[in-house]
């Protein structure tokens, strides 16, 4: 059995997959304890996109769209997460609307970080193109 479930959440052991890229899900997760890594795998090469810690959340996009998961999430060491489905999320937001604001704030930070990452790679790619043209 990959994980253990109790009333306070689900527990995962080191290396256990919480969900896989391209799987279908309608839940998000909040890390109660431990760390997870968010990864993409291409041609057998695993790239770590993020390391998330206690208090962080992941899988939230599945609450808002019908697309498959965009990455795989694995436990680093022992991890305990709280799983929240769409119905529970909407209930929590109706009781505490600031929850939605805090999530949007965190998602905005992630988008800004991704923008910076994409820009840095675009600059590197342009530099390579410029260098190769110098040798032509």
Q: Can you name each region flagged by the protein language model?
A:
Residues 1-136:
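Cytosolic regulatory regions built on CNB/CRP/Popeye-like sensor folds
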